[in-house]
């Protein structure tokens, strides 16, 4: 959530920044309501001053033997007016909060300006896409042929956009999860968390999924709770409504969780394979840090996500997202896109974002820089470290062999009981 004081003090500048995200005129309702709020506060103050002064006057009149009945009636009416004004003030402030909760974060000055992904800028590449001496297959063909991915039975169980992993496929998924957690905890200094997979609505508001993106979430019927769309939600909200110690920052947190998304706006996109699912596994990275360090931490976070792909030998590129392609809560985002031979293209496998104080303000996560300093909001960062299903898909496509088998990357073999290759089942 943006700082209301910042908006009022720099309305034109904030409007200009929001226009970079393709939004125009979004501050007008806020500014109009804020002016209404100011006028109500003036009226409340006037009524309270009248009531206080009149109360003193009534006391004097009684001492002097005068009848204060008329003035007492005016005081009673003033009290009623204050009550009505307070109710109106609460309504206006609720409307202001509603508007603020639907305004996205402001882009960092280094973010390229553009309408959509066409304006994203490539930052670097790692690895060379493999040159095949045969026609490479897509993972949605490789997996079923190996009898490790079953889309038809998944549809029988749950409908579209689900996958059943079987045998070596299930083991490969689990191997990738454990490998990622071991690297992030053992080499990169993250603390592993195993959070609940359901959260209350306040947590979804804190990280920015609600209220704007409610249709993309799975809500529990009859309860004010949601299935998590990403572990970013519980990890960040672990410290909701808390004051942290500066000496304890930064926090590096990681978690493996299943993620649940309705994908309401993705009809017709990536209908085959595991790229866009209602349920998928992911290892998430979250950081809470002091504001002056957050962009350095973003670079480190992105490198941490890149590292696991390097160890797997999967070619990728890093792009910085344009203002029109960034997520709602982000001030700056790097996407890591892995090479997928079946698509003959790079596909997103991780997004690494600095949200600055946007989420912390919504979730009220603060810290005190030193014992005498005023409380400040921390900066929050998050990134996939990385998506598990998409990793499995990338392994199947990049390590496929002409006979239909798939080589297991060396770093995963200890997690696979020494298995070096997944072969097609014998007829």
Curated annotation (Swiss-Prot):
SUPFAM superfamilies recorded: Class II aaRS and biotin synthetases (SSF55681), tRNA-binding arm (SSF46589)
Chief site of localization: cytoplasm
Pfam family, one: tRNA-synt_2b
Enzyme's top EC category: ligase
Reactions it catalyzes: tRNA(Ser) + L-serine + ATP = L-seryl-tRNA(Ser) + AMP + diphosphate + H(+); tRNA(Sec) + L-serine + ATP = L-seryl-tRNA(Sec) + AMP + diphosphate + H(+)
EC nos: 6.1.1.11
Pathway assigned in UniProt: Aminoacyl-tRNA biosynthesis; selenocysteinyl-tRNA(Sec) biosynthesis; L-seryl-tRNA(Sec) from L-serine and tRNA(Sec): step 1/1
Recorded GO CC terms: cytoplasm
One GO biological process term: seryl-tRNA aminoacylation
Record key words, sorted: Aminoacyl-tRNA synthetase, ATP-binding, Cytoplasm, Ligase, Nucleotide-binding, Protein biosynthesis
Location(s) in or outside the cell: Cytoplasm
Amino-acid biosynthesis is among the record's keywords: no
Binding site for L-serine: 230-232, 284, 384
Gene3D superfamilies assigned to the protein according to its UniProt record, in alphabetical order: Bira Bifunctional Protein, Domain 2, Serine-tRNA synthetase, tRNA binding domain
Residues annotated to bind ATP: 261-263, 348-351
GO terms assigned for molecular function: ATP binding; catalytic activity, acting on a protein; serine-tRNA ligase activity; transferase activity
Quaternary structure annotation from Swiss-Prot or TrEMBL: Homodimer. The tRNA molecule binds across the dimer.
PANTHER family recorded: SERINE--TRNA LIGASE, SERYL-TRNA SYNTHETASE
Domains as described in the record: Consists of two distinct domains, a catalytic core and a N-terminal extension that is involved in tRNA binding.
Family the entry assigns: Belongs to the class-II aminoacyl-tRNA synthetase family. Type-1 seryl-tRNA synthetase subfamily.
Stated role: Catalyzes the attachment of serine to tRNA(Ser). Is also able to aminoacylate tRNA(Sec) with serine, to form the misacylated tRNA L-seryl-tRNA(Sec), which will be further converted into selenocysteinyl-tRNA(Sec).
Official protein name in the record: Serine--tRNA ligase
The organism of origin for this protein: Syntrophomonas wolfei subsp. wolfei (strain DSM 2245B / Goettingen)
